[in-house]
Amino acid sequence: MLSPDVLKKLEAIEQRFEELTQLLSDPAVAGNGDRFRKVAKERASIEQTVTALRAYRKLLEDVEGNEALLADKDPELRELAKEELAQLRPQVEPAEEQLKLYLVPKDPNDEKDVIVEIRAGAGGDEAGLFAAEVMRMYVRYAERRGWRVELMDTSGGALGGVKEATLTVSGDAVYSSLKYESGVHRVQRVPATEAQGRIHTSTVTVAVMPEAEEIDVQVNPADVEMDVFRSTGSGGQSVNTTDSAVRLTHKPTGIVVKCQQEKSQLKNRTMAMKMLRAKLFEIEQERQRSARDATRKSQVGTGDRSEKIRTYNFPQDRLTDHRVNYTRHNLPAVMDGDVQDVIDACRTFYAAQALREASRGEAGAAERRA
């Protein structure tokens, strides 16, 4: 059974949901576009929790009703009740665990769009080929989710591979899903260039950064040095007759970003500034995380980039996420963007971990009060 404290928190969320529902029908709110969107967004953010709470209550009512029938004089009713309880009782504990997960504080960046950087690591040309496949995997996943993807910068490699690529992905709560992709992705397979049929291991690094607004990060124009140059294609050849590509250097940190995908220098500069703000925002986020808990090595919800988070084993048609001990097969589907189950496994694992840590914190606080 859920503890009284957990039930109290869930009931408070339900009460807030009812208040927000009433506000949406208030003419004063309906006539104010910004206020209406804010109320609707908050309501949508807790609707799933309220739906699960009400389904849980209904489940308990059904269990209680069928347990009462076990004492009925009619043997047929008793037998039916036993059959129902055999199906209902196993649903109670998973429903309770799910409700607890809904109480985990949300990452304030979850609603943000993201910038994804993909780089070929160890493995030469094979790493570049896999980097191109990983990039396509994210593009296909974004398409499945109805998100928008823009290629901001790319550096081509041999055989159609990619040395590095930068994408922006925008849509509904993009960071809440893609944040689990940060880290080193390892591939094991026989490369197309391997004549002996030997299995090689290559790596690709992925960095996912929440897109930062100007209100999140203030960049002093005097700290930014801008260079312009002609856009180049995958083979290094010039593909533009004007200096439309932009390179920005943030002098205090040494961060360098560039964008050459647009024909307009102004558009490239705008996109490059977006990349720079995201990198500076990530640095500040990392600083705050370290300050909160300098002893913890794991970075919940961000992914440690020095860690091999996932292995794609093609000879065995198997994907393994090492952080959450999750394994699945059918790599062709995975590389075509069918990765929602992997992301869900990561989300559930880290939410449960955060819930345990929060519970330990509350228990410690209770002991200190006692």
Curated annotation (Swiss-Prot):
* Gene Ontology molecular function terms on file: translation release factor activity, codon specific
InterPro entries assigned to the protein according to its UniProt record, in alphabetical order = PCRF, Pep_chain_release_fac_I, Pep_chain_release_fac_I_sf, Prokaryotic/Mito_RF, RF-1
Q: Which UniProt keywords apply?
A: Cytoplasm, Methylation, Protein biosynthesis
GO cellular component terms, alphabetically, are: cytoplasm
Q: Which residues form the signal peptide?
A: none
* Chain positions with N5-methylglutamine modification: 237
The compartments listed are: Cytoplasm
Q: Which Pfam families match?
A: PCRF, RF-1
Q: How is it modified after translation?
A: Methylated by PrmC. Methylation increases the termination efficiency of RF1.
Extract the ranges annotated as region (Disordered). Answer: 286-311
Please give the SUPFAM superfamilies that the UniProt record associates with this protein.
Release factor (SSF75620)
Instruction: List the PROSITE patterns.
Output: RF_PROK_I
Compositionally biased spans, kind Basic and acidic residues: 286-296
Superkingdom, according to UniProt? Answer: Bacteria
NCBIfam families in UniProt: prfA (TIGR00019), PRK00591.1 (NF001859)
Enumerate the HAMAP family for this protein. Rel_fac_1
Described function: Peptide chain release factor 1 directs the termination of translation in response to the peptide chain termination codons UAG and UAA.
Q: Which family does it belong to?
A: Belongs to the prokaryotic/mitochondrial release factor family.
Which protein, by its recorded name, is this? Peptide chain release factor 1
